[in-house]
Every structure is written in structure tokens, then in C-alpha cells.
């Protein structure tokens, strides 16, 4: 199967998981990116079962609304039973690198509220150690250079994310993103806490403190379900 076919496979598997485990009338947390889009497309077929969704980005909001799925602000919701999102990398403990699509801060906020985080990914995203995929850090623009120096001191190579025309990429929150290459993150929780403490960091794209509860992993043999132990 192609990577796109694997994404559609796990998108449908996530919709099936929601149908089986989330009661009718609930609100679903939805992530951002190409794999999350496959979940949205599958969810659209059963949208009448649920009140709607909480979105993690402007792009996701637009896709949900295009399917006629009502979008709630997180502040309107008392509880969120499930959050479904992709990952750029996921390790054996359920820690992830996320943020390739630029929505890491809102993704982390919505994930933190959800009872269950369901990661959906193709098999190439499973890694023994996080860091081959550049680690995104959303930063306040004036802190970009200072954060870059801190990253360099840890052995990373900071690269400012830019648009096709060479301008700094701007997040939905009005900030910039540094993508850090050359890392091997043996202690995701510790590294997440360390970077998040730097002045000027909005959030780092490490999801270790709030990692996945389970992963639906698309493989040539079908969908593999991996359950991670509670922290």
C-alpha cells in the first residue's frame, strides 16, 4: 500500500474506534495534518452521531465545516473523551514529535484536555528514538535567535521555518517555528520540560508528558493497535 492508502486506512480505523468507544452526542477532539484529514473524512460519514468537534487549527476547522461538522471552541466544552491526531514520530512509550503541520500548540492544548489520545500513523512513523524528524519549537518572534543559541548548545541545528516565498512561517497564534535537526531524544519528558521552560518558547513539539494512550498504526498487514501503559 502507498503512504496515502495507509493514512486512509488508519483514518477509517480511528472513526471505527470512536464509534465503538465514544457515546453518541459527544464532542470529538481533532488534530491537524494529512492523516488527521483522513480521519475527518471518515468521521463525516457518522457525523450525525456526535454533537461536533473541537479543532486544533484553522485548517482543520475549515475541513470539518466543509463536511458539515459543527466546530466548538474548547472553552465551550466541559469534557473531551477522545482526541485523534497524527504524529511525525512515535516511540515505544507513546511519546511523539508533532508539529510538522505547524499546529503543535493548539494540538497540545486539546490533547491535554482529552481523556484518551489516539495517535494515527503509518508504520514509517514508529521509531526507536525520537529526533530524526526535525523537532518543531513554536517561539515568540523576538526570542527566535536566543532560542536558536540554546538549541545549538544542546547539539541541535536550528532552522527557521519559512514559506515558499522565503518569509517566516507564521502559526495560527502569530508566532514563528524553529525546526531543530540533529537530535537524539533519549529522555522525551525531560527534554520537553527543559525546552518549555526557556523564555520565549510557546511550546515544543514533544508530546511526552501527554503522550498517546494508543496508536492505530497502518502497516502492509493492516492496522496494528498499540496500547501504551498509563504514566
UniProtKB/Swiss-Prot annotation:
Transmembrane segments: none annotated. The active site is at residue 107. Pathway: Carbohydrate degradation; pentose phosphate pathway; D-ribose 5-phosphate from D-ribulose 5-phosphate (non-oxidative stage): step 1/1. It holds the Pfam family Rib_5-P_isom_A. GO terms for molecular function: ribose-5-phosphate isomerase activity. It comes from the Bacteria. Substrate binds at residues 32-35, 85-88, 98-101, 125. Keywords: Isomerase. Its EC number is 5.3.1.6. One of its GO terms (cellular component) is cytosol. SUPFAM superfamilies: D-ribose-5-phosphate isomerase (RpiA), lid domain, NagB/RpiA/CoA transferase-like. InterPro entries: NagB/RpiA_transferase-like (IPR037171), Ribose5P_isomerase_typA_subgr (IPR020672), Ribose5P_isomerase_type_A (IPR004788). It catalyses: aldehydo-D-ribose 5-phosphate = D-ribulose 5-phosphate. Catalyzes the reversible conversion of ribose-5-phosphate to ribulose 5-phosphate. Homodimer. Belongs to the ribose 5-phosphate isomerase family. This is Ribose-5-phosphate isomerase A. It comes from Burkholderia cenocepacia (strain ATCC BAA-245 / DSM 16553 / LMG 16656 / NCTC 13227 / J2315 / CF5610) (Burkholderia cepacia (strain J2315)).
Amino acid at each position: 500500500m502507498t503512504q496515502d492508502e495507509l493514512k486512509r486506512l488508519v483514518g477509517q480505523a480511528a472513526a471505527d474506534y470512536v464509534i465503538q468507544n465514544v457515546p453518541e452526542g459527544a464532542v470529538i477532539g481533532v488534530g491537524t495534518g494529512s492523516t488527521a484529514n483522513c480521519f475527518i473524512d471518515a468521521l463525516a460519514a457518522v457525523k450525525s452521531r456526535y454533537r461536533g468537534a473541537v479543532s486544533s487549527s484553522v485548517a482543520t476547522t475549515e475541513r470539518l465545516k466543509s463536511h458539515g461538522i459543527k466546530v466548538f471552541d474548547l472553552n465551550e466544552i466541559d469534557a473531551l473523551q477522545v482526541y485523534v491526531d497524527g504524529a511525525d514520530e512515535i516511540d515505544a512509550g507513546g511519546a511523539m514529535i508533532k508539529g510538522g503541520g505547524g499546529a503543535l500548540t493548539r494540538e497540545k492544548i486539546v490533547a491535554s484536555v482529552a481523556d484518551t489520545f489516539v495517535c494515527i500513523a503509518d508504520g514509517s512513523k514508529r521509531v526507536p528514538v525520537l529526533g530524526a524528524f526535525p523537532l518543531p519549537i513554536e517561539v515568540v518572534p523576538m526570542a527566535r535567535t536566543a532560542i536558536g543559541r540554546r538549541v545549538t548548545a544542546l547539539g541541535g541545528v536550528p532552522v527557521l521555518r519559512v514559506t515558499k516565498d522565503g518569509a517566516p512561517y507564521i502559526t495560527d497564534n502569530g508566532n514563528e517555528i524553529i525546526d531543530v535537526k540533529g537530535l537524539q531524544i533519549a529522555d522525551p519528558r525531560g527534554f520537553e520540560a527543559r525546552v518549555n521552560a526557556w523564555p520565549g518558547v510557546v511550546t515544543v513539539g514533544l508530546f511526552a508528558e501527554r503522550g498517546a494512550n494508543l496508536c492505530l498504526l497502518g502497516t502492509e498487514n493492516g492496522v496494528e493497535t498499540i496500547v501504551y501503559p498509563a504514566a
